[in-house]
Design a protein with these regions (language model features):
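N-terminal signal-anchor transmembrane alpha helix
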Residues: 2-33
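Membrane-embedded alpha-helical bundles that constitute the cytochrome b-like, heme-associated redox core
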Residues: 20, 26-27, 72-75, 93
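Core segments of transmembrane alpha-helices
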Residues: 53-66, 114
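Structural signature of hydrophobic alpha-helical transmembrane segments
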Residues: 75-84
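Interfacial loop-to-transmembrane junctions
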Residues: 91-116
Length: 129
């Protein structure tokens, strides 16, 4: 079995995007003087925190379904959807930090990619002999 390099790169990109959201929370803590363990503060801090939390919640679903789709269906299509998912998460984060009502397009992109990956994983699993 060959090493699935492209899915590994997608996974790394997703984890880097998550780490970026964590760093944004740290920056917002410093800028707005929100000391740990506080989880509330000015709206810009809370928006950054919500981006990080939601991204973590989405990663829990994305990573397993992405790898199942890549291994059991199509590595190429799964990787393409994975890269688009990462872009959607970045757009979600940027939009949310600009204004909470601007988070929709990024969320929609990443959500649709997750659903497509889920369908690929299910079809791939049931097509195995």
């Amino acid at each position: 079995m060959s090493v699935p390099a492209l899915p590994a790169v997608v996974s790394l990109a997703a984890l880097i995007a998550y780490q970026g959201s964590a760093m944004a929370v740290g920056q917002a803590r410093v800028k707005h003087k929100v000391l740990p363990p506080a989880m509330s503060g000015p709206e810009p801090f809370e928006c950054a925190l919500r981006v990080q939390q939601n991204t973590l919640e989405q990663l829990v679903f994305f990573l397993p379904v992405f790898w199942l789709a890549a291994l059991m269906s199509s590595e190429t299509w799964a990787s393409l959807l994975g890269f688009i998912w990462v872009g959607g998460r970045v757009a979600y984060g940027v939009g949310y930090r600009m204004a909470p009502n601007k988070r929709g397009p990024g969320f929609g992109i990443s959500f649709l990619c997750s659903i497509a990956l889920l369908v690929m994983a299910i079809l791939g699993a049931f097509s195995q002999r």
